[in-house]
């Protein structure tokens, strides 16, 4: 409500259904309004909590360390992701927790490190600067989905990223790096699946 004090990581919006995610405050401060605001990717107004930051970035008490990945069960990992409100970055905001529990068996996870457009370097920089986080995340996905193998796909014009990720997976038996030709639209998911796995996703089907 208006006037409430909130902290970083505090839940300020509950998930309203299965295909939805909770919202958390990214700052500490005071709620100054609850009103419709333009959504960044939807192009329409949604109800928003407007917070005036106090500049302190004080963490909420609910933000606590979890058990190690080896100690967590697949269901516990999915619940953590769900409660954290993690969603995809493709614009639709699809809840990641739903993808971590596929309806059908999955044998391979493809980590798409190919840019979606020529001259972009977003995925390239993520691979270079967050390599350990990527490996950790892929381990978590393999555990929750039950997939036997994780393949990190990188275009051949990113040699430094290729070398770094190959070094990271060298002693991990269920991970490997696939070097793909730098060719548009290599980053499109169905194109990538056919290139790496030799499998064709049917028209209208989802990978």
Can you annotate each of these PLM segments?
Residues 148-207:
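Hydrophobic alpha-helical positions that pack around
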